[in-house]
């Protein structure tokens, strides 16, 4: 349908668009990793007794049907598979639903599957309760929340018997813990991805982020929210998406097309997009994504420097979950803030409502001279490169811009008079934005690498570091290693080796002079390097063996 709509245009732009979309292959993983579900067909129906007992016989093709009534009426005769509980909790996915409740004859909560069918779990859940026993914005595979919408039952009666067997789906993400800024050495940091998943697939044990591939629905908001690319979308990966965008625009122009506008949309909106393209100008090029939120500011701005005059984001507010809407809105607000700070119109990147098809007017001019090659590097590097190009040709050139509180851009400030250069901040920094000078006591900072995770602020024992959310438009200042603090080194009083910041040695001497282990000449060891300190301890033991008991 989409192809025929594109080919219906006979003008130059229309022909160029059809050639670009039909003739550009998106390189992706043709055999992606998969996740496998196993279902024996054990169904649990939850809801009011009157409703669930009326349905039981309609699922006779399934392996088993268990009924769980949530009202307090008396049991109907003839239903040995009927249980009662008003306190029900459930977790899991297709083939592995664990339902816990307190049923008659049990003093405590029990696994209902073990009680009812002798298994650890149910395979499917049909939920007819008003509020649902699982509260995820995007239901887990195998969980069907009907509530009071009885019109859905007929289709489920037909569909559920087919949910027995083995089912595969793609594994939509890649997770690299080495890049994650969530925690380090017991200090908690970035948590942007945790509240970005509407499917409940992400969790944290306080040390690492985990993604349950069985709950993941491929929405991509976690990857968009992740500032370090510890989480990346895999179908396709962001670089392939951007390369595809670049090739489409390049092919469009090679075929004679002019003034391209990109319209990103999720696959489920293909019908609405096809209808819209029949009316929109033929210079509007539609780019399909698995989900709209799988790409963010780096892809949007890359499209502008590839030659797109405008980037439109097709959204359907009738079904978009609140979490996706929030992540997308935050990302869009940041993009539009960058644009307006440079004097560009905010709607060069904007949401597109299908009801505006008739009144849409495209931009006639590009913002910059398009780049000839697709951008490479991390998503931050591609974003910064795009912004630098736009900044160069901007009418307004700000030095710094404020950003939202949790935006992954900014600096750190340090109250240097109380800094001891203990390097606790360096030890936890996940991106090496903060790092030591190396050959002498000192602390350096690279603003472009800072994702504002906050671990340095929490790890500092002297509480002298604080975050400064902002965007620095001076690309040289943003990239260079800036000196935060430096001081003379303390030299070992025994061998002369520089071994620690002088202020730290002074501070430790003052704090430990009353300690039992540092009485008399022992206090001198604080002013020694590690080798001389050990040597001095053993020399003292040799002279006074009884001193071993005091070390």
Residue locations for each model-derived region?
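Short linker/helix segments within small regulatory modules
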Residues: 206-210, 439-444, 482-486, 506-526
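Short metal-binding segments enriched for Cys and/or His
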Residues: 231-235, 457-459, 464-465, 522-546
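Ferredoxin-type iron-sulfur electron-transfer modules and their immediate structural context
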Residues: 1-195, 259-271, 275, 313, ...
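Short hydrophobic beta-strand motif reused across regulatory alpha/beta modules
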Residues: 202-203, 222, 231-232, 434-435, ...
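Cysteine-rich micro-motifs
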Residues: 213-220, 447-453, 519-536
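Glycine-rich phosphate/pyrophosphate-binding loops
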Residues: 306-321
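A contiguous, basic/glycine-rich beta-loop/short-helix subdomain that forms a polymer-engagement track
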Residues: 233-257
